[in-house]
Amino acid sequence: MGLCVVGLTVPSAVASADPTGGSDGQTWLAATETAPQYPGVSVEWDVPITMSDGTVLQANVYRPADASGRAVESKAPSVLNITPYTKLLGTLVDSALSIPQVGETLMDVANSLDLAAPFDGVSELTGVIAGGGARVLGVNRDLVQNGYTQVVVDARGTGFSQGNWDVLGKREQQDSVEVIDWMSKQGWSDGKVGMAGISYSAINSVQAASNNPPALKAIFPVEPGNDLLRDIVGTGGGLGVGFMPLWLTAVNGLKLIPNVQDILQGNFDPLWLASRLEDPGTLIPELVQAMTAQRIEDVSPSTLQVAQDGQFYQDRSADVGNITVPTMVYGGWHDIFANSEPRIYNGIDLPAGQKQLIMGNGYHVTPGGGFGKDGAPPRLDVLERAWFDKWLKGIDNGIERYGPVTMFQQGGGWITDDQFPRAGATYERMYLNSAPSGTAAHAAYDGSLTSDQPSAAARLTVAPGLRGFCSGDGTQGTAGISVVLGASCSKDSRFQEAEGLTFTGEAVTEPTSLSGPINVHLETVLDATDGFWAATVNDVAPDGTSTPITNGALTASLRAVDDSKSTRSANGDYSEPHHYLTIDTRQPVVPGEVTAVDINMLPTDAVLQPGHRLRVDVYAASVPRYLALGPMLADSQLKPQHIELAADRPSFVNVPFVGGR
């Protein structure tokens, strides 16, 4: 019996709410489109802020100004953005958007650009401008010209700030607390501070809020992570080689650019230079060794601490249960931090409305893509303004009635709910079956996905390959940069499926919804002492397009699960297995023996439309999204890997169907 019956969505208490914000959303938009309260912006460049250990951070301070450019005297709430990408990046974005002709042209082009294949990915990238993401990344002049002071600070050890880059560590978190305190005591401050920003800046805003500085009153984190190892550094024990090398190289390169103005004025900072000479390439030696070492015994202690779970990552994971200030989290199902974003929201102990979650369908480099269009949420900059107007200025604009959970339902459209996962989800096994589905002749193997256990035993073999470079996995793993390859790569798995095992269900007859995390359980056999497994869950359209809706991976020797941190569904199966991902709990595989592995997939929300099918893809590699660490890769010998399909030890996917099926 296949997946051919009905899945009915159970409406939640707020399912009729409008993802656009309705009349309130129009009010928020109007607030950003009308003439600003102040005509100008005054910028004070490279303001020194001295930390408790004597290290000096550099900040740009943007204040409301009159027509002559002179800062107004009135006190205002302030918004903080701490960045490792240098204040220069925000300045460049601000400069481009603040020139009337240029900014208007960019917005017009971004709103109208709709390129056909193979250039459709370019339209996704430009959507960050039309959707307001660029304003949140840079300086939001709408905020400043409407009575806010915005402060952009180079994180310790980056940009023009002194010190060694701490990469979201405890000292950097203390810096955030001290900068907030400094801001609240300035003559231009009314004592209320908010935090905003994208990615790294969003992470340190979540960290700061968990440390409860008194002056911090609200945060607006866009694409924050909170489990950096499982999010992107070492998902399932596989290094994120599509992102980490490029990211570390970029930040370390940017931090070496000196303050040319200070040099010209004879004010060059020798302490800045000393710190750069002391640590020119933070974490790069560790990254290289993690990729190239052939034996664990050859790995240095500094590399081990970033290659496995432990104190390094515990220090960088915020206790979101401590957060007491209003928090609006924006994320995306295909973001590199998709694992963390719903967890952050669910972990905050605040009433709905004071905490909110928006999950889009984009990638890390496309925040806000599609926002502001019919049926979609307001632009990100509009939401940011409304959020701070409410919680920093006390304006009754209804933003607390938005959401509280606004999601792009993959396969459908934007919906609003009162929780994620949505109520009414029931986990059910769908079994991997060797019987051909007749839908994937292009795949290395075309199997089926059934409600009943397979009656015939089979061993299926899959070998590592490189087709992941043109896949949804690859696009997510490069933070969305490879979306330029077009939807035939990013939104259709058929190219990658040529080197994968596919298991496809029967076509559904009515809309069938699923909501929450998913687990893929495999009974495996290896010919070496290690191996690597990657899996995706896909929505297969009648025309054959195989769209990935979630993914996951696991190094076979790191399969040990910490049950104290894992979740099981009512049927007794894992819905969210939490792997230790430590060397001490590593279990080399015995070649030839059947070994069970559970692969936790990213949380998701999706609907299969009538005629569509559910598919599970299984691969022995998915580069560049994941690459096994050097010693594990060496132990695998890149040999083919096998899945055992049998009634007494079945392989299956545990799926959260909403309202049954």
Question: Where in this protein do the model-derived segments appear?
Answer:
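Secretory targeting and sorting signals
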Residues: 1-17
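Catalytic-loop region of hydrolases
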Residues: 15-113, 137-139, 443-490, 660-661
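Accessory cap/linker subdomain of secreted extracellular hydrolases
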Residues: 84-145, 210-322
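Alpha/beta-hydrolase active-site loop
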Residues: 134-135, 145, 167-186
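Conserved alpha/beta-hydrolase
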Residues: 144-159
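Alpha/beta-hydrolase fold nucleophile elbow
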Residues: 187-199
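C-terminal, loop-rich substrate-recognition/catalytic regions characterized by aromatic stacking residues
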Residues: 278, 373-661
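Short beta-strand/loop motif that positions the catalytic acidic residue
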Residues: 323, 329-331
